[in-house]
């Protein structure tokens, strides 16, 4: 009987880990496709704006407002060649030294480093593309995108909302997270590796190997124990997000991940 129980438990553990790894990989691809769609929105509008003799024409400003109203961009900005940015809400700022603007003026579609908000504790990025007129770059078009909301949306229907997601740089800095506070005590800027280095690893992977996976953008999964008892066991699945060398992770109690196999346990 003990042998049978061991066999079933191993079966459940193996298949739960496979499901975790597969789900995180699929959601990473989904996230990248969503961002590519929004790059498509920007490029389409930028092409239209480039047809105007005046980059700040009334028609272009109307397109700017419409872009913000009809997409998931929270803010949009039309930027002149000198770095003066005109936002959909009427604000005017200078972004001449921002990396995303400088790269867009070189003809690249760019993604900014994460911008943390002290107001709503969420992380945003700027997507930016060049505006061309007769093959000459005359400005840039950008939109701010909430990656915390994106991360949350991706995993809303997985495992009955149990667990939480993280977006982490390859160096281990947490730049976005979601989920119920009861599941975690983390904040922006925390080091993913420091958080987990003193926890008990129940899988073959070591934290050193996880660091190597992050650096190389490889998929992986670890099983850890955060406390002294089995009830604290967690799976952490991770994969490359496909932008800015970031990784996306999903953390869930083992008991929740294995719920679908409860009929076998009983």
Per-segment meaning from a language model:
Residues 37-43, 65-85, 108-109, 156-182, ...:
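Short N-terminal helix-loop-first-beta-strand/juxtamembrane motif that initiates sensory/input modules
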Residues 61-63, 88-117, 182-225:
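Extracytoplasmic/periplasmic sensor domains and loops in membrane signaling proteins
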Residues 75, 128, 235:
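Short hydrophobic/aromatic beta-strand element in the GNAT-like acyltransferase core
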Residues 196-265:
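Extracellular/periplasmic juxtamembrane segments that couple receptor/chemosensory ectodomains to their
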Residues 89-92, 145-147, 176-182, 254:
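Short beta->alpha transition motifs characteristic of CBS
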Residues 140, 177, 247:
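Short glycine-/small-residue motifs
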Residues 70-72, 81-157, 161-164, 169:
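Extracytoplasmic/periplasmic ligand-binding sensor regions of membrane-associated signaling proteins
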Residues 1-55:
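Juxtamembrane extracytoplasmic/periplasmic/luminal helical "stalk" adjacent to the first N-terminal
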């Amino acid at each position: 009987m003990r042998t049978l129980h061991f066999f079933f438990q191993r079966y459940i553990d193996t298949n739960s880990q496979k499901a975790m790894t597969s789900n995180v990989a699929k959601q990473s691809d989904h996230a990248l496709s969503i961002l590519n769609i929004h790059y498509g929105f920007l490029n389409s509008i930028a092409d239209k704006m480039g047809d105007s003799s005046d980059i700040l024409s009334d028609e272009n400003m109307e397109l700017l407002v419409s872009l913000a109203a009809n997409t998931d961009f929270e803010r949009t900005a039309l930027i002149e060649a000198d770095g003066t940015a005109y936002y959909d809400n009427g604000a005017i700022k200078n972004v001449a030294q921002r990396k995303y603007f400088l790269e867009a003026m070189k003809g690249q579609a760019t993604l900014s480093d994460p911008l943390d908000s002290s107001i709503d504790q969420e992380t945003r990025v700027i997507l930016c593309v060049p505006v061309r007129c007769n093959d000459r770059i005359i400005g840039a078009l950008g939109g701010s995108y909430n990656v915390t909301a994106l991360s949350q949306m991706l995993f809303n229907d997985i495992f009955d909302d149990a667990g939480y997601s993280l977006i982490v740089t390859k160096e281990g800095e947490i730049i976005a997270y979601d989920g119920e506070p009861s599941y975690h005590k983390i904040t922006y800027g925390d080091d993913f590796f420091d958080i987990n280095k003193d926890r008990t690893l129940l899988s073959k992977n070591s934290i050193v190997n996880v660091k190597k996976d992050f650096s190389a953008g490889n998929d992986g999964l670890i099983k850890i124990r955060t406390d002294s008892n089995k009830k604290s066991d967690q799976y952490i699945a991770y994969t490359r997000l496909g932008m800015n060398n970031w990784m996306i992770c999903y953390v869930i109690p083992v008991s929740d991940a294995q719920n679908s196999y409860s009929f076998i346990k009983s």
